[in-house]
From Swiss-Prot:
An example Gene Ontology CC term for this record: plasma membrane
Pfam family, one: 7tm_1
Gene from which this protein is expressed: Trhr
Full protein name: Thyrotropin-releasing hormone receptor
Extracellular side: 1-28, 84-99, 169-193, 289-296
GO biological process: phospholipase C-activating G protein-coupled receptor signaling pathway; positive regulation of cytosolic calcium ion concentration; positive regulation of protein-containing complex assembly
Family: Belongs to the G-protein coupled receptor 1 family.
Disulfide bonds: 98-179
Subcellular location(s) per record: Cell membrane
Glycosylation site list: 3, 10
Amino acid sequence: MENETVSELNQTELPPQVAVALEYQVVTILLVVVICGLGIVGNIMVVLVVMRTKHMRTATNCYLVSLAVADLMVLVAAGLPNITDSIYGSWVYGYVGCLCITYLQYLGINASSCSITAFTIERYIAICHPIKAQFLCTFSRAKKIIIFVWAFTSIYCMLWFFLLDLNISTYKDAIVISCGYKISRNYYSPIYLMDFGVFYVMPMILATVLYGFIARILFLNPIPSDPKENSKTWKNDSTHQNKNMNLNTTNRCFNSTVSSRKQVTKMLAVVVILFALLWMPYRTLVVVNSFLSSPFQENWFLLFCRICIYLNSAINPVIYNLMSQKFRAAFRKLCNCKQKPTEKAANYSVALNYSVIKESDRFSTELDDITVTDTYVSTTKVSFDDTCLASEKNGPSSCTYGYSLTAKQEKI
C-alpha cells in the first residue's frame, strides 16, 4: 500500500512489520532537543542584538535577521514535531496541524534560501559596484526586499494547503496516521523538482558566480574606493613629516576597510557553503525518490537528513560568533545581566604631536583635521584649533595640539 508522507522532515510512516527501535527513539529525541534547543536560542539572540543595537542595523544584518527568523521557523515547525513522531510513531496534530506545520516548514525553508540569495546579491553590489551601493544597499531598501521575499514565499507555499491530507494505514498491531498527500506521486513529484530547482539549484549557482566576482575584487584586485571615503581628503602638508603621517593614516584606514569587508564576506560565504552542503542529502533524497517506484525511507538515513537540516538552521549564530567580532561583543552584552539599558556618550581626550613651520610671528600648519578611529568610537573627523600649546621657537619645531573628542560610543 503506497502511503507517502509530505516530506521526510515529518515522516511518520512505519514499516508494517516492525516498530521503531528504542535506540532510534532515544537518539532522535536527544539530537533534536539539543540541536533545535540551541538553535532556537541562538537565532533569537541574533534577532535581539540587531534590533537592540543601533550600530548593527545594517543592510547585511537585516538579511541575517530574516534568515534567523526563517531558521527559527524550520527548527520549530520541522524539528520539534519529530519528537512526538519518535515517541508515538504517528501524527498527533490532526488535520489542521498537518496543513499549518507543513506550510510553516516550507515557508521557513524557502524564505531562508531567498534570504541567502538576497544578502549574496547585496554583498556583490557593495563590493563590486560601490557607487551603486550608496543607494541600493541601504537599510530601508533591505527591509523592503525582505518584505517582498516573505510575501512571495508565503503565497508560493500556500500550494501545500491544497495538496495535503491525513493518511491512515492499518497494520496488524497498529493504526498509523501520517500527514501526506491526497494526490498521487505523478502529480506531486514535479512540485518537488520545481522546489529543488528554484530554491536550491538556482540560488547556489548564483551564489557561486557572484562570490567568484567578489573574490576577484577582494583578493586579486584593489578594492574599489568608497565615494564617502574619497570625499574625506587631507590638505597638502608643508612638511615631509606631515606627508608621511597622512600617507600612513590613509593606508591604515584603507587596509582596515579591506580587511573588514573580507571578513564579512568570508562569514557570509561560510553560511552559503554550509547551506549547500547540509541541505544536499535531503534535497538529493527528494529528487531520487521522485523517480523511484518504491521510495527509499530507511529510518537512520532519514534521521541523518533531518539532523543536517536542523544543524544548518542552528549553526549560523555560532558562525557569527566565531567570525564576527561585532556579533561576538553584542552576544556578550546581551548575556550580561548588568548591562545598562542606555549608553551615554563617552568623552575621549587625545594629544597629537607633530611638526609645524614658523612663518613670521605665527605658526602655520596644514593639518586642519584628522580622522580618529577607536575600538568603541565611530570613525570621527576632528577639527583642530589654530592655537599652538607649545612654546614658540625659531624654525620648525614640535608642538602639541590638544582637543577633546566627544563621540557616541558604538554599540557593537
